[in-house]
Amino acid sequence: LRNAGTALGFALGQARALLGSGRPALIFVQLAHEANETGLIYGPGLAQFGIDPDAVTLVRAETVSDLLWAVEEAVVCTAVAGVVADVATPHKALDFTISRRLALRAEAAGTSAILVRYGLEREASAARYRWRVMPAASRPPPFDTRAPGLPRFLVTLEKGRLAGLAEGTSITIDWTKDNGFAVADPGRSADEDAAR
C-alpha cells in the first residue's frame, strides 16, 4: 500500500476525463474496513484533480460482494460518468469472470469502471487496460523551487494498446490542473508542457 496515493491519484485523473454535463456523477466505492486503513478521498484533493467534490458519491461497502454489487449497479446509471472501486487487498471474488461482467456492463452503458488494486502480482482481468503506476519526482513550481510540484507518475501499460503505446511501454506523465495528464518533457516544467 506504499504507493496507494499514487495509484488512486492516477485513477482520479482518468475519472476526471469522463465527467461531462450529460454524465456529471462519479461513484467512489471502497470497503469500509479498508477505508479505515487506507483513508478516504478528500474534497480539496478532489478539487486539485478538477473534480467537484459535490459530484462524487462515496460508497463504503461492508463486503466484497456488496462492493461488486454497488459497482455493477452504478455503471448502468445514466447519470454516472464512471465508477472508481478502490480495493486494497486481494479477494477471491475479484476474478476474471466478475471483471468480464463489469467490463461488459460498463461498455454497454457507455461508462467506465476503474478498479484500483495494490500489489506487485498480476491478477486475471478482462479490463481493456491495465496500468502499473509508480510515483515519480515532481518538478518544483517556478515560484519556489523548494516546494513540491504537481503530481507526476511513472506508468507502464501492462495490458492493451493506447495511442500508439504498446504493452510494456513506460512513460512519465505530469498532472496539470487545466489539462489533466500530459506526457512529461524532461526539459520543461509541467506548466510549459501543458501550454504546448
Residue spans for each PLM region:
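N-terminal regions of ATP-driven nucleic-acid and macromolecular assemblies
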Residues: L1-R196
